[in-house]
Amino acid sequence: MSKLFPNATQRTKAPYRFDIVGSFLRPEALKLARSQCQCGDISCADLTAVEDQEISKLVAHQKQVGLHAVTDGEFRRTFWHMDFLAALEGVQEVDAKQFSVQFKHHNVRPKTLKIVGKIGFGEHPFLEHYRSLQKIAGDYPVKFTIPSPSMLHLICLVRETDYQPIDLYKDNEQQLLADLAQAYRDAIAKFYALGCRNLQLDDTSWGELCSEEKRAAYTAHGIDVNQLAKTYVNLINESIKDKPADMTITMHICRGNFRSTWFSSGGYEPVAETLFGHCKIDGFFLEYDSDRAGDFKPLRFIKDQQVVLGLVTSKSGELEDKNAIIERIKEAAQYVDINQLCLSPQCGFASTEEGNVLTEEQQWKKLEFIREISEEVWGK
């Protein structure tokens, strides 16, 4: 029982009181193997063997630190989103003059996505990624992360100022959205059939729609940002509408996470009523590690979802003040019941293979710190 909140209890279902976003720093052995594979010095099979080995170590460490569900750390990916989206049917990764958003003080590899055919899920390579993770984890619960469907629309149609639709989608954006939602329904069904019961959608579109700067820029290009928010909520709802009752689907909202930098700022208020009030997701992983995320007042629109507070930054290795974190949980509990709140890092530790600016030791100490706080707040 919690001494801080007499009514607070632990959870036995995702999202958990002590949880994670999903990605972890890539070990040096994995970075070396990927580089060697790209140079042709080792085969793809050799790289997969190294990935398997490093994911096995990672899973063991996650169990040791007390996580209730383990991830593969996104060790088989270069980006948190591009690898998945580019492997959809009808989507192609292409070179670009620059990445589709600009991070503070850092440049990302200039790649973007292009829709070249009918969007579908097909026999996506991430199905094998999930199978491998489940095999490594054994009977232990696993969590799997994929980008939200809105990310494909955002990258190809919104950030891209010179979008040229293929004939299939010319003057028919609704068909594109319908095909995209169907692709995700197929994905959810296939992951579920493999045993997945804890799926997370990662989404930076909401971070952009919280930003006054981004909203002004999109408005200047003729985009109705309020309607875009409604479109994305509808797209997500259509994508998850056939979700089985015993499957949890959450969404992580991010403002950018590349080498400890970011690309947008702003509180949740501009999208709160639309997103929190109408999106039928089971839980939200929300960044709240800095002033860039604003206050907790937007949480007043939360209905019966769980809210995982990302109060502990993954962008640096320095530990926060425990009492300050607990006070912020108390603040959030003014808007959402304490038993609808959980705690996690603000984001993953390596949304891209480069990773954030902290050590692996600091990464694990962050998680031990979060577990300790969660036990004080919600009990053991």
Question: For the regions a protein language model found, what residue spans apply to each?
Answer:
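Domain-level signal for soluble alpha/beta catalytic cores
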Residues: S2-K380
